[in-house]
């Protein structure tokens, strides 16, 4: 990277896209030669240092989680049956959620990242609304949890599903959108879903221009 910066003339450069890796991007943004040039950090949800002329094109995971914590704190009744389904890679998130909801029940997935139906059934109740917070970026666990939570719903049993971070894994076409919809799946996002073939004003302007 030093070689690229030191051997190129950036005087006619309008903008720099990347590097893709946040640590490399942060290093580039410290260089005097490109300090005034707009630099865009693409794709990654990991935060970059917001120095002069730095722009992050994707909302950071940390920011989305912070907003979801605030929403959950204001919205969930502490007397509801709050269940945390958290895999081994999200223990820090589990800790923060338990600080918000100390009475919450933690449901541990099996080693192969699935939930035991009998255990799910025993932890959900009929007498209170069941609020399930799912923290995982593993497709197997997400699929297992959404399927089983959906199956638990009945006239007597209410189940709603939340996550503090909806990763791209949720775009997998093998996940049932109907099940997630039935669970009133709630999460933060940095983009507004559009219907197929529908464009917003910025996209229409871009298409007409280019």
What is each PLM-predicted segment?
Residues 1-2, 51-54, 83-84, 101-116:
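Short beta-strand elements in bilobed, periplasmic/extracellular small-molecule ligand-binding domains
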Residues 1-7, 65-68, 112-123:
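Structural motif
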Residues 42-44, 87, 104-119, 136-137, ...:
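A generic structural motif
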Residues 50-55, 116-120, 168-181:
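Glycine-rich, charge-decorated loop segments at or immediately adjacent to ligand/cofactor-binding or catalytic sites
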